Amino acid sequence: MGNLLKVLTREIENYPHFFLDFENAQPTEGEREIWNQISAVLQDSESILTDLQAYKGAGPEIRDAIQNPNDIQLQEKAWNAVCPLVVRLKRFYEFSIRLEKALQSLLESLTCPPYTPTQHLEREQALAKEFAEILHFTLRFDELKMRNPAIQNDFSYYRRTISRNRINNMHLDIENEVNNEMANRMSLFYAEATPMLKTLSNATMHFVSENKTLPIENTTDCLSTMTSVCKVMLETPEYRSRFTSEETLMFCMRVMVGVIILYDHVHPVGAFCKTSKIDMKGCIKVLKEQAPDSVEGLLNALRFTTKHLNDESTSKQIRAMLQ
């Protein structure tokens, strides 16, 4: 326990090295049941990202159909291009629901009495690693989604075509797979700039409101502690040297940023105010010490997807660091 506290307070000279082992943490017997549940969800995350990365959209077909409204062949070509894409978008959306449930199970484990969030993170490293993997996935998904306007365009065209055909009393086979209620929910999901982050934020707020006997600090302290551990691992040569690849370094930075953003959305006054338990200046400094091309996306995530950066309570110095 003392080791992790020393990590958090930077007393790092004379103690057995401790760090959150993002590469090798294995579940204890006490963690195994929840770990298995979360693992079953996370095993699909890479295929979701690969599928999203390969998503090219039906832009040319839609454009041709809109420019030639009386050409039935072009209308059919656009529709046949869009339908399989909508089925893929449904898969992404359904994964977000599974992720939401997974996060709530993790939060329950990592915040429950009698242990403090810090004690939980030290005792349950495999669950902390899964929490980190959820955040890592979330930032990667949202980065890819933000760079792909085809998703919104395809889905809008799909909704318009369905509505037009309803007026003409036509029922299309795809409505058996993506009915009106599902389409409405998907529409709200994809309308968000960062849909997976919004999902995690909602899941965390829902967890807090459902567990009224649990102080909100238990949840926000879990997040701020995770941020501190990531920051100290990144800025301490002894810890960095234990990462076996650049990929783990990037993973750690992405997780740190993901937790900051989540904290900023969940905490009543956010991550940037003076009373915040997150050392924002230190976190930004750590990012800026890396190769610019590797962290620009993460700095942009702090600039554009946090909630409280532009509040009056945010210091000018922090704002200037993110200019």
Curated annotation (Swiss-Prot):
Keywords carried by this UniProt record: Lipoprotein, Membrane
Entry keyword annotation includes Lipoprotein: yes
Topology of this chain in the membrane: Lipid-anchor
InterPro entries listed in its UniProt record: CYRI, CYRIA/CYRIB_Rac1-bd
Location in the cell: Membrane
Molecular function terms, GO-annotated: small GTPase binding
Disulfide bonds: none
GO cellular component annotations of the record: membrane
Record GO biological process: regulation of actin filament polymerization
Subunit structure: Interacts with RAC1 (GTP-bound form preferentially).
Recorded family membership: Belongs to the CYRI family.
Name the UniProt record assigns to this protein: CYFIP-related Rac1 interactor A
Species: Mus musculus
Biological classification of the source: Eukaryota, Metazoa, Chordata, Craniata, Vertebrata
